[in-house]
Amino acid sequence: QLKILNRLVVQYEARLIEAEAADNIIRIVSLSLRIADTKAITMALSIDRGDDSAYLKYLQAGRMDETVLLDVTPAYALLKPAEIARISALPIRVKLQYLMRDPLERLWSNVRMLAKRSLNEGQDFLVNCQDILQRVFYTQEETHIVTRGDHRSNIARFVAVFDRSQFQVGFAESLQDGPKFDSMCAYWGINATSARQIKPAHVGVAAPFPEGLRRDTLQFLKTQYDFVADNFADLPENWRKNRELLA
């Protein structure tokens, strides 16, 4: 984790030099803030982790009268039971919401992100995506991708530690649904804004899913579709369409 953060600082600083050369004030300010924030979290995570006081201090930096602090990351899906228990023991009131994204779309998004990061000069982006995808379900490589999208196992680990008042499961697609988004905000204890005002962030490189691999990919993800269909009502439309292809 620290190595990744240090690499990010180097990347941001290189972009900052470019922004300064172009006299792009907005970009300069944005990158400067991002560099400062990344260095701050790196420092917090570098300190002895006997407790999490340094991280909590980082999380609350700049806090004034806000009643809720939100920490958003897909990395929580990788936590082991002991680490989840550690979260529950924090000296603050903790509530978690696990948002499930359509398994195929989530997998393809993760694959595209990795393909972009590992792309070599002259290499075709889509070919790199397909290579990663085939490694996932033909040779069982890139196991972290599977773990991140293993809704069944991830939910079970959190439910074993948190009760229903502290842990809620929903669909990522509900972020674009007014009433369901309002319900999410009520759970968090914050006022809801219009779902239409939500703008996608960290959008990956667009690339069409390789149709020749769709059937095998859906079959690979079948247990996830079945688990969610068996345990949650009102599947989003994109979930239903992909699941129907398995019939």
Feature roles, as predicted:
Residues 101-104, 154-247:
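The conserved 3'-phosphoadenosine-5'-phosphosulfate
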